[in-house]
Regions:
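Bacterial N-terminal signal peptides that target proteins for export
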Residues: 2-14
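Bacterial N-terminal signal peptides
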Residues: 11-23
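Beta-strand-enriched, solvent-exposed domains that form extended recognition/catalytic surfaces
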Residues: 50-175
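Fold-level signature of zinc-dependent metallopeptidase catalytic domains
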Residues: 176-236, 246-256
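Active-site-proximal segments of metallohydrolase catalytic domains
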Residues: 241-317
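Short pre-active-site segment immediately N-terminal to the catalytic Zn-binding motif
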Residues: 314-335
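Active-site recognition of the HExxH zinc-binding catalytic motif
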Residues: 332-348
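Post-HExxH zinc-binding segment in Zn-dependent metallohydrolases
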Residues: 346-368
Length: 368
């Protein structure tokens, strides 16, 4: 990820659009006290606290419409941290959640990033409000710490403040940290020339719903969408600093699940239309496999390219974005969902509600 360049790109985007609204130990806060945003501390120096590698914490986010909790799946080693080495403390403060990495010995905060979750949206649905419990997988990634750390997850409250929800102690020398490399046989494809990962906005496309017999189409689609993306501002004028890669991820079946039509496909990521029974909402609910495949290449931003001609997609801030490959509006959908993913931008239109109670997402007196 580019250092100050990505900062300027995001600042430009967000000023002109509405914002949406042994070694391991964990603790879910039972009755937490609010966490103040506070003033920005002195910037931590990357080389003092982190190596060139990355740490991924895979989590389960579970609950109902009125309660939720996080639990640990596993901590995973990744070979390269491609992200910022300058803005280690998130300067924007966007998202319904944030995670903070704190040095265990000194309690100094050395990394912070905001994010949103699909689970937050589900909590407002009729299903969740009726008391049904569900779980979804999520991950947070950060540079590999040189010393033991504590990872804190804080949830934004209706008034904009944060409240602690979960904490996890991690010793980077622990033998419990997974170093397995699933899907290592999948090939990474370079889609455009660009600078090295620490000086680029690294964008990764993971194909979904492409069977082995679709390989030629997969290759064409990867290159077409990388090219289309760079034809639009603000990315066009910054394309020398943006690097696209793809992963040749194949599914057992072509296409994507469409439950309302009775179509259920066996695909590598298990993506599906009709998320939360919304007609066009296309998402990946369980993202563990997506993260495993994505770890094969450097990435700051993550696309899922779905082999379908039906209109639809989805995007979650600092998580992922999903678009379709063969619709007349596919280029628009790609760019639209990227705005959700990289900058937390809201929809530029509104024609249907996912949440059963819009006040849950946009509290009166707080938003707008």
């Amino acid at each position: 990820m580019m250092h100050s360049r990505r900062f300027r790109l995001l600042r430009s985007l967000c000023c002109c659009a509405l914002l949406a609204g042994p070694g391991l130990a964990s603790d879910a806060a039972a009755a937490p006290a609010p966490v103040s945003s506070g003033s920005a501390p002195a910037k931590p120096v990357y080389a003092e606290w982190f190596t060139d590698e990355a740490m991924r914490v895979d989590l389960f986010h579970a609950g109902s419409g009125s309660a939720e909790d996080y639990s640990l799946d596993e901590v995973v080693w990744e070979p390269l941290w491609p992200g910022t080495r300058v803005h280690l403390i998130d300067p924007f403060g966007f998202g319904t959640w944030r995670f903070r990495v704190v040095d265990a010995a000194s309690s100094r905060e050395i990394f912070r990033q905001g994010y949103a979750t699909l689970f937050d949206e589900w909590q407002g649905t009729a299903e969740a409000q009726a008391g049904v419990s569900r779980s979804m997988s999520e991950s947070v990634r950060f540079p590999w710490p040189r010393k033991p750390v504590v990872v804190h997850l804080d949830k934004r409250q209706r008034d904009g403040s944060f409240r602690p929800a979960f904490s996890l102690g991690v010793d980077p020398s622990s033998h419990q940290i997974s170093r397995a490399r699933p899907f290592a046989s999948f090939r990474t494809v370079e889609l455009n020339p660009g600078p090295p990962p620490d000086k680029a906005l690294d964008v990764l496309i993971v194909p979904e719903g492409y069977a082995r017999e679709d390989e030629a189409k997969l290759q064409r689609d990867l290159r077409r969408f990388a090219r289309v993306f760079l034809e639009y501002e603000p990315w066009k004028s910054q394309q020398a600093h943006i690097r696209f890669r793809g992963v040749e991820s194949f599914s057992l079946e072509s296409g994507v699940s469409e439950p309302r039509k009775g179509l259920h496909r066996d695909t590598i990521l298990g993506s599906s239309f009709n998320t939360f029974d919304s007609e066009r909402y296309l998402t990946v609910v369980h993202t563990k496999r997506l993260r495993q495949i994505a770890s094969l290449a450097p990435y700051d931003a993550l696309f899922v390219m779905v082999n379908s001609g039906r209109y639809g997609g989805g995007g979650v801030y600092n998580q992922w974005s999903v678009f379709v490959s063969d619709n007349e509006y596919d280029d628009y959908v790609m760019l639209h969902e990227f705005g959700h993913h990289i900058a937390g931008l809201a929809d530029e239109y509104y024609d249907s509600a996912i949440s059963n109670d819009e006040d849950l997402m946009y509290p009166p007196g707080v938003e707008p």
